[in-house]
Amino acid sequence: MQWFNVVLQGVLIGGLYAMFAAGLSLIFGVMRLVNIAHGDLIVLAAYISLIVTQAMGVDPLTSLLLVVPVMALIGYALQRGLLNRTLGEDLLPPLLVTFGLSIIIQNGLLELFTADSRRLQAGTIEILTLQVTQSVWVGALPLIQFGVAVAAVAGLQALFYKTALGRAFRATSDDQSVAQLMGLDTRHVFAMAMALSLAIVAIAGVFLAIRTNFDPAIGPARLIFGFEAVIIGGLGSMWGTLAGGIILGISQAIGAQIDPGWQLLAGHIVFLAILAVRPQGLFPKVSG
């Protein structure tokens, strides 16, 4: 029963990793862009939530009503005003620009908030638990977190295949020139994709800030977790991203149970093993 609890906790933390990864998977699937600043944008969302909770006196989950649209607007403006100019056959310019953006965000947050760790307080929901079996209890907040992750992935999947915006994403991803001939403004489509990506980032950032301490320097580690979940699941696959996050979470939970120092190492080992056996990931949708 102890190992059942370990695996269950790994599944639940995997939901957070899936939210880290969903935005990466989305923008890579639409515009083949790898956003090096993705982890720092997660941290930025956490700090925006901190500002909202302190200024308005609301709880972190309620702050999502403001943090999500703010991050979406930042994503749209960032893509439309800067990143669209870097897209092309060469993958290096967007990598360099987003790397520079990562440094700017980290140093900006460091100047504004110092290097001190912060944490969002969500109240009684943090300590509320539900009994699964006689010896297994699950926190309400991790359950909510996982449910939100599943809903986010399902929502993105439905948007991609059942809406006009999703058809625009797929058309632009397949062939930009043909999409433009069809009357699509690819710059707007890419900006909408980034806005949607950062909306998911906002949710991930708030849940991260409730779950653990955060500071301006933790972004790169979140990027690695998200990247590993994307690669495990398969590039461009939303449900694969969820599966990748869960596999990564379970791996880390089992590693931590064996030895606390093995938590991160176990996740990296599983990532490398899957990459060696199945380089395209478990459920790939993007090739070439």
What feature does the model see in each segment?
Residues 1-10, 16, 159-164, 190-232, ...:
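Inter-helical junctions in multi-pass inner-membrane proteins, predominant
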Residues 1-19, 48, 58-64, 89-95, ...:
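Membrane-interfacial amphipathic/re-entrant helices at transmembrane-helix boundaries
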Residues 8, 30-77, 81:
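Membrane-embedded helix boundary and interhelical linker motif in transport proteins
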Residues 13, 135-214, 238-244:
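Helix-loop-helix "hairpin" substructures at the membrane interface of multi-pass membrane proteins
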Residues 24, 57-101, 108, 243-248, ...:
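Alpha-helical transmembrane segments within multi-pass membrane transporters and channels
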Residues 40-44, 86-110, 219-231, 260-278:
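Pore- or pathway-lining transmembrane helices of multi-pass membrane proteins that form conduits
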Residues 85-86, 90-162, 189-192, 254, ...:
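Transmembrane helix-bundle core of multi-pass membrane transporters
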Residues 112, 174-181, 185-188, 258-288:
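Cytosolic-side transmembrane-helix boundaries in multi-pass membrane proteins
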